[in-house]
Amino acid sequence: MKLLKPSWVSHNGKPIFSVDIHPDGTKFATGGQGEDSGKVMIWNMAPVLKEEDEKNENVPKMLCQMDNHLACVNCVRWSNNGLYLASGGDDKLVMVWKRAALIGPSTVFGSSNKLANVEQWRCVTILRNHTGDVMDVSWSPHDVWLASCSVDNTIVIWNARKFPEMVTCLRGHTGLVKGLTWDPVGKYIASQADDHSLRVWRTVDWQMEANITKPFSECGGTTHVLRLSWSPDGQYLVSAHAMNNSGPTAQIVERDGWRTNMDFVGHRKAVTVVKFNPKIFKKKQKNGGSPKPSCPYCCCAVGSKDRSLSVWLTSLKRPLVVIHDLFDKSIMDISWTLTGLGMLVCSMDGTVAYLDFSLDELGDPLSEEEKNSIHQNIYGKSLAITNTEPQLSTTIIENPEMLKYQQERRNSTQANSGPGATGSESATPKLNSVMNGESLEDIRKNLLKKQVETRTPDGRRRITPLCIAQLDTGDFSPALFNSAPILPSGSSMSNQLTSQLSSDSSPGQAPPLGLRPSQDPMLISPPPSSAAKVLEDNKDGVKSCLLLTSASKIEPMKALDSRFTERSKATPGATAAIASSTGLTPSERPKESTPMQKDVKSKEDTSSDSEDKMATINKNLAFNKRKPELLMDGAEVVEKRKKGRPRKDKMAASIAQPLTQTTSPAEREPSRAAAAGAGAAAPTAAAALKLPTPSIKKAFTLQVSMDPSVVLEVENEVSVVAGSRLSQLRCSRDGRDWNTLLPSSVLTAAGSSDVVAVASQDRMLSVFSSCGRRLLPAIQLATPASALHCSAHFVMVLTSGATLSVWDVHKQKALVKNESLLTILSGAAVTVSQSMLTQQGVPVVGLSNGKSYCFSLSLETWTLIADTADSLVQCADFRNCLPNQDAPMSSGPLAAMQGRNFNAGRLASRLSSTPHHLQQSMTLAFLENQLASALTLQSAQEYRYWLLIYARFLVNEGSEYRLRELCKELLGPVHKSATTSWEPTTLGLRKRDLLREVLPVVGENLRFQRLFTEYQDQLELLRNK
């Protein structure tokens, strides 16, 4: 054995916490503390291996130095193929580095040109999720996953094929997690923490396999790291700091039953790091000796806080070698060469040591074929994971139905990969022509546009030179992990992912605008009254977008990235249904809003004839959007109009929301006499809310149904009989007309295919059938009607006294009786912006603060169904759970009230750094809220839609408990019982039919095949019965 301590490997006296040798053995990386930041350094291995190379000045020793980490680097690890280097530090970040192929040497910043970076390594992605220092990182055997652990007590598994996607977050440790290691066959990952436990996790479902605590019960959190290691044959897991009879040991955990009967003993202080040699050895045959069968064995190195290093062979009871006082401080990390004969050790004293062994000392290493043969004999076929998804290829599919769903999913994945991607050339972009969605020629042109040109007094041009470095396209190679380069700003978004979501934009829409990677899109949310605008600035030759968004106009958000475009397309029938239930007040729009209306309408989609018709109808309809007035005793309520033209943002707001129709302030202005008549008493606590009432028009026309076509015509004061002024209501239904007379002027009217209702100035409500027959006697309202809606055979009235009532005309029964809106109208600044009545008779009210409520008939209370400012909406992300064949829902009341708000929220969350685990939990809560809201609204179509998305989300996230509970509820009792209260249907949908739709979704994930088989068999049993 040879021992060398290269003095030139140093972090300027600062501690070195990690070391790792490149798989090809030509270089090694160190990580530790820098001057004022974390430091990652890559060194040449040749001067370590050969003395002549160390003395040769032409052979560089340091290859690269990276100071991107803001705090100390605790771990560096090369990927198994050697293309990537991962580093984790106290700045809570995991950085993945790749060599820049086409950039030449450069000097290290701040080194006075003494240190030169021979190789250029740049950070290709930053993984953000941990909330504490990252202590260890580790690549899985086939580079499918990258694991990181932290002092936040969690282990995060990253999808190394799709950085920065997170696969899962393993929770269970109650102390700082300080070490990770992968099972060499990819079935388990083990972690060790300060909570006196070593935990083993399964990779098939990311659940805990074993929790080993006994050997660690006496341990204290005295070590900086706990780097455990798995033997190359997979049979043994050796922990770091353990105790046996109050003495420090390295505990040996057997894979079979996770028994802890053996340990490595001898170190005087706590063991900090254990590292197995990657090779499996057999005894070396002497010259001329006949080969004798011998059991393969492994080699393990153990480092401790006592500054000593021991090397063990599993075929010997005592260590092969022990080196005392190798360093001045604790040993922090160990790394073996891939040949198995060299080892690097680093210490907190800032130095490293290299140990070179011979074959006589360790034995003959087995070839890779022999090593794989051992794995196959013990575990079956080795895990050759080639699928992009974290599914193990060795998992046996036990159910033929499951096999069918797996094949269908594979076929759909191939079909979605693109019709033109038939060959390798079409599937992979050319590296020398495209980078991050822009051609290199475009990038050069954009850079040239940044040149500053001035002219001297004599007229000569002076151009300031602009350095254009050679563009490095090697960084953007999609060969490994299919990973896209990150934005220079640190954001993990990439334009390369743009094509992954199918675009459903109509021909009339503008294509998405391209954003350069160096520019961060800004999302600025002004008050809701402002209209949506897109300001384009062509400075620097690039279109930069400034988004001013309102609650309902989110179209320009496509300009950021087509990944975030999930537009809701209203069907013609849905548009008609919504229009028929809006209860609009007859009035004409103010003249000043007409130009703006035309401008906006030219930008919107008018793809169907019915939508054009509805736009024409809504042109003559209006609904008040003024804030509710607080009528107090003696308080004068006078609204002064400002001189001049109204503000543009207020005009745009009058047409921005599709379900809100506005009128001019003059039409809704209360009379000054009425306001002055209130007196001048001091305001009291018993302030009454008052909603505005429609103004009386001489005549108006209202189309309330498209199929069949129902048109209402109202003409006030058509004649005077015996001093009474009569008004006429005429209804045209499929060419058949009927009319009736009313003793008072009509304020508003509404109708459906079943009933017609009118509210009069004398606070009377009249209800007629579709043929003109009066169905109910005139209903006396407490206050004048503010809004009126009809849907099917239900009638809803919202009065100016802020009360709401709903009647079932067929049953002649009140479903909601004078329910006050006081509980939801909190504050004088909140007003009713829209209202509607569903086909099932459920009233819905939308407020100006972005919240929407419906009155639950069963709970008899107001329930919140939408909130534009809800943080759950801001972070919900279920794009991966949307079925490919379904368009975004647009026909239900829930979608009508929410609009595109949650699309905007998810876009905003992309521009911020929301932790993935938090986004995961909030998405789950959001989907459950959607299910509950659809159930309250009695919207069967939307309930089924969100149920399938919810089930797919649970399957993708591996939430077995919730998924099992959902399936159990849908299945119901298998055997009949007198005590069961299970309802076989919900909203008219058979629950077991819904379960049959959910099961194929469950069948897409192999980890749930037992759950799939269990409920599939029970459904078949019930069907046979």
Swiss-Prot record:
The keyword Nucleus applies. One of its GO terms (molecular function) is nucleosome binding. One of its GO terms (biological process) is regulation of DNA-templated transcription. WD repeats lie at residues 11-53, 68-107, 129-168, 172-211, 220-263, 266-322, 326-367. SMART domains: WD40. One of its GO terms (cellular component) is HIR complex. Signal peptide: none annotated. Keywords: Chromatin regulator, Nucleus, Repeat, Repressor, Transcription, Transcription regulation, WD repeat. The keyword Chloroplast does not apply. Residues 412-433, 490-508 have a biased composition (Polar residues). InterPro entries: CAF1B_HIR1_beta-prop, HIR1-like, HIRA-like_C, HIRA_B_motif, WD40/YVTN_repeat-like_dom_sf, WD40_repeat_dom_sf, WD40_rpt. Residues 588-614 have a biased composition (Basic and acidic residues). It is found in: Nucleus. Residues 408-433, 490-534, 563-614, 634-678 are annotated as: Disordered. Required for replication-independent chromatin assembly and for the periodic repression of histone gene transcription during the cell cycle. Belongs to the WD repeat HIR1 family. This is Protein HIRA. It comes from Takifugu rubripes (Japanese pufferfish). The gene is hira.
